[in-house]
Amino acid sequence: MTEQELQQLVEDISLKSFGMKFRHKARFNPRLRTTGGRYLLHSHDIELNPKHLELFGLDELIGIIKHELCHYHLHLQKKGYHHRDADFKLLLKEVDAPRYCAKIPHAQNSVKTRHLYVCTGCGTRFERKREVDTSRYVCGKCNGRLKKIKG
């Protein structure tokens, strides 16, 4: 899909789903790693991750476009455009847009757990990136002692 085809697709979705024109730029940004797209507040442009189109197809991309257009139209109407706002959640439901996009497999910033602790009282497992001082910290569920298993 070319940039012109993407621009036309975003304009069509905006008219059909929202009944309003999209008057700014839509483009692919291959630098996006962990997100499907983003709405830029200062320029009102929308950037989309081309990997989502490659890996998940056009339907996933259309969902991401609808999600970003929710941010776009609410921001221009001076309504709540954040994920936490009621206006945003309501508009997502109205246009059948997803709240989250599919995760890209093998994303570069996946969390690697190096240390594994187990509570001696209740058996709860705690995976941590950083080491924990077991003499200072206890289990949050039962106040039991922590025992280091891995790391």
Curated annotation (Swiss-Prot):
GO molecular function: zinc ion binding
Positions of the SprT-like domain: 6-150
Signal peptide stretch: none
Keywords of the record: Cytoplasm, Metal-binding, Zinc
Keyword Isomerase: no
Cellular component, GO annotation: cytoplasm
Cofactor detail note: Binds 1 zinc ion.
Needed co-factor(s): Zn(2+)
Cell compartments where the protein resides: Cytoplasm
SMART domains: SprT (SM00731)
Entry binding sites for Zn(2+): 67, 71
Active site positions, chain numbering: 68
GO biological process, one term: response to stress
Family (UniProt): Belongs to the SprT family.
Protein name stated in the entry: Protein SprT-like
Organism: Halalkalibacterium halodurans (strain ATCC BAA-125 / DSM 18197 / FERM 7344 / JCM 9153 / C-125)
Upper classification of the organism: Bacteria, Bacillati, Bacillota, Bacilli, Bacillales
